[in-house]
Curated annotation (Swiss-Prot):
Pfam families for this protein: 7tm_1, Rhodopsin_N
Motif ('Ionic lock' involved in activated form stabilization): 134-136
Gene: RHO
Protein name from the UniProt record: Rhodopsin
Site feature (Plays an important role in the conformation switch to the active conformation) residues: 113
Organism of this sequence: Globicephala melas
């Protein structure tokens, strides 16, 4: 084995020379240079400085403006809540541990940090699944006489949290475990060892199939059908120009969010899958650290995409930031009708 396994950790460094120490007790400078730990700390600080204001402001503006509290906006708000979980439960912890070059909070802190990071990532993934299903139902109209309403939106929210908990909670109760990963300053699922006493391999397979592959299949199916339907409706002019424009805008926004999610999370999932299928192989700590920390940027890009592509939210946000005055004027407020119209599409 080219790594060193302990009771609650796996360090990707051979202990032939006797230099490996517990990542819960000693700095891990034998894994990387001090400046590299400083870079990680600076990156986490940047995520906190950018992630908290963007996501908090999204929630605050929605509370302030009643016209934003529509069923189709529930899931993007859910994303903001999940991102704040990651900021407070994960990023602040990792910032502190990176400054010390080891996970100073011990196994219990590792469980909490790994739980919040996994929970936030899975809520984001399942939120995109629900968004895809919502857009598919509203635009493609597979069920006639269906009107998307608040109850459906609440059911979607519940699904995201139930599925996210089904992925993040088991390692806390004995099915797999959370351990420090990469440079040992943040924690995640144990992809590195078989660990028979916690049935580690079965959990990793379950997670990859149920909480990664199946959601992506659903997303691609829904958007494949959606793109086909929008193009067909536009060609046949079956709907009003206003409705078609609204559907295209919202669809474009969600597709960009999905692509951005894949760019951030597929590298992490791919590296994790490689490590899982090549346990004991030789790889450096940076091999897992870079995809892991890159994936954390999802807490920033999702709200940015939503704000930039949702004219109504952007208009309300500018009004809030500018103390009740919108420097762009009220022209964009006219998008309210087009945005909400898609939630009450008439039967096909």
């Amino acid at each position: 084995m080219n790594g060193t396994e302990g009771l609650n950790f796996y360090v990707p460094f051979s202990n032939k020379t006797g230099v490996v120490r517990s990542p819960f007790e000693y700095p891990q400078y034998y894994l990387a240079e001090p400046w590299q730990f400083s870079v990680l700390a600076a990156y986490m600080f940047l995520l906190i400085v950018l992630g908290f204001p963007i996501n908090f402001l999204t929630l605050y503006v929605t509370v302030q403006h009643k016209k934003l509290r529509t069923p189709l906006n529930y899931i993007p708000l859910n994303l903001a809540v999940a991102n704040l979980f990651m900021v407070f439960g994960g990023f602040t912890t990792t910032l502190y541990t990176s400054l010390h070059a080891y996970f100073v909070f011990g196994p219990t802190g590792c469980n909490l940090e790994g739980f919040f990071a996994t929970l936030g990532g899975e809520i984001a993934l399942w939120s995109l699944v629900v968004l895809a299903i919502e857009r598919y139902v509203v635009v493609c109209k597979p069920m006639s006489n269906f009107r998307f309403g608040e109850n459906h939106a609440i059911m979607g929210l519940a699904l995201t949290w139930v599925m996210a908990m089904a992925c993040a909670a088991p390692p806390l109760v004995g099915w797999s475990r959370y351990i420090p990963e990469g440079m040992q300053c943040s924690c995640g699922i144990d992809y590195y060892t078989s660990r028979q006493e916690v049935n580690n391999e079965s959990f990793v397979i379950y997670m990859f199939v149920v909480h990664f592959t199946i959601p992506l299949v659903i997303i691609f199916f829904c958007y494949g059908q959606l793109v086909f339907t929008v193009k067909e409706a536009a060609a046949q002019q079956q709907e009003s120009a206003t409705t078609q424009k609204a559907e295209k805008e919202v669809t474009r926004m969600v597709i960009i969010m999905v692509v951005a999610f894949l760019i951030c999370w597929v590298p992490y999932a791919s590296v994790a899958f490689y490590i899982f299928t090549h346990q004991g192989s030789d790889f450096g700590p940076i091999f897992m650290t870079i995809p892991s920390f890159f994936a954390k940027s999802s807490s920033i890009y999702n709200p940015v995409i939503y704000i930039m592509m949702n004219k109504q939210l952007r208009n309300c946000m500018l009004t809030t930031l500018c103390c009740g005055r919108n420097p762009l004027g009220d022209d964009e407020a006219s998008t309210t009708a087009s945005k909400t119209e898609t939630s009450q599409v008439a039967p096909a």
